């Protein structure tokens, strides 16, 4: 038996999909514990690219049970489309489990998300407008609708009608928007009831029994640590806890049941949307990373902001998550650069900071302090052992490992499943 958490150590888009897929091949269960379809990852299988946003990666393996945990928020209409896409690719989705306690993203959540974001103007967060934030807000305000509510048609209607009363007041009085028609929403969700009935379960009990029976379980995180609602670059964050502690809470298991916590980072760093980014490269280096790394959002299609790897924020992620090890992806993207840089400090008012600052304002005013490394030109996509990497690539990896003080045990050198180095 083993229980492993895989999560992003940056602002998301670290290549978690490939890493999760690596673990999922031997897992009995793969559990998503937070987020919704605001996150996306692409898994390359031969000539096919499969983009998933809500369904756990374990769905690709017939012996694995994919679980959407209690900490997730579920857009059932989107889930229906994603399951249909998988079925068209002859991928069986019958084993999917959805926690009865997961919350439902309603149509009014998506509308409110869009209106709120537009109202912020230049101060916008950069939300995906998928309704995730408003759905989590309803959850905290104790008026959310959960998956189990759809099983009782009468109770579901009562809750929806009550919520629509409040929503329509907000729409008409604050945003000058036409009110929503409650019957349209009820009609739409009547077509989703079979999906819920076929997949709903007590996910916490299911996972607890799996642990008791010595099964292998993978907890799959979405987004990244620096987007955590409590520990990220607030307010430019997501609406859930993306750090490792939520793997237990969002799945319904105790933290002592977690054996291994794997952080995933790119060999550089990227960010989608607004917010501070000290090592961002708005120059030819940034363009190189974006184009060679195909840095465009799976969900939004937006061009990602790219820059040099920030070891201060990475060491912070190690601490916040109690990472046991680090996986590095996209090392191959750096091939061809004459010079590489690692951020090893923040300079603020003539003071060099080497710990991630608790005062977020520092991130808006500080300057990065870099250590410079020679690059390499070799194609490393076929390399299978660390010793066969170019010497400069080895030096780069060793410098990262020495700074963050946890072992690097996996390096991805290409997008294919097999293009990896296991250390």
Question: Which residues does each predicted region cover?
Answer:
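Non-transmembrane, aqueous-exposed alpha-helical and coiled segments at domain scale
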Residues: 1-423
């Amino acid at each position: 038996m083993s229980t492993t958490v895989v999560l992003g150590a940056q602002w998301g888009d670290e290549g978690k999909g490939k890493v999760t897929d690596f673990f999922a091949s031997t897992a009995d269960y793969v559990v998503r514990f937070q987020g919704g379809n605001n996150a996306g990852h692409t898994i390359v299988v031969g000539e096919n690219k499969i983009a998933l946003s809500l369904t756990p990666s374990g769905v690709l393996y017939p012996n694995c049970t994919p679980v959407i945990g209690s900490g997730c928020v579920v857009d059932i209409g989107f889930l229906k489309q994603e399951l249909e896409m998988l079925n068209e690719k002859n991928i069986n989705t019958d084993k999917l489990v959805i926690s009865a306690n997961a919350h439902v993203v309603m149509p009014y959540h998506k509308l409110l998300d869009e209106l709120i974001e537009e109202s912020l103007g230049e101060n916008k967060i950069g939300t995906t407008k998928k309704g995730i934030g408003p759905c989590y807000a309803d959850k905290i305000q104790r008026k959310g609708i959960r998956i189990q509510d759809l099983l009782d048609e009468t109770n579901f209607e009562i809750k929806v009608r009550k919520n629509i009363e409040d929503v329509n007041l907000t729409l008409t009085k604050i945003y000058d928007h036409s009110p929503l028609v409650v019957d349209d929403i009820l009609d739409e969700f009547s077509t989703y009831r079979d999906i819920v009935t076929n997949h709903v379960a007590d996910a916490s009990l299911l996972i607890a029994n799996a642990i008791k029976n010595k099964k292998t379980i993978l907890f799959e995180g979405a987004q990244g640590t620096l987007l955590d609602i409590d520990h990220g670059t607030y307010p430019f964050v997501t609406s859930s806890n993306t750090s490792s502690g939520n793997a237990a809470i969002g799945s319904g298991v105790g933290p002592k049941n977690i054996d291994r916590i794997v952080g995933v980072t790119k060999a550089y760093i990227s960010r989608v949307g607004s917010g501070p980014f000290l090592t961002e490269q708005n120059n030819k280096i940034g363009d190189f990373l974006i184009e060679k790394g195909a840095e465009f959002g799976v969900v939004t299609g937006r061009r990602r902001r790219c820059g040099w790897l920030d070891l201060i924020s990475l060491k912070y992620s190690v601490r916040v998550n109690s990472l046991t090890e680090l996986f590095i992806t996209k090392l191959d993207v750096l091939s061809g650069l004459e010079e590489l840089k690692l951020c090893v400090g923040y300079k603020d008012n003539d003071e060099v900071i080497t710990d991630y600052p608790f005062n977020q304002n520092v991130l808006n005013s500080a300057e990065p302090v870099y250590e410079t490394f020679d690059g390499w030109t070799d194609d490393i996509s076929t390399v299978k052992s660390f010793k066969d990497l170019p010497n400069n690539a080895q030096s780069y990896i060793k410098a990262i490992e020495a700074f963050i003080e946890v072992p690097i045990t996996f390096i991805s050198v290409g997008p294919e499943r097999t293009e990896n180095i296991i250390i």
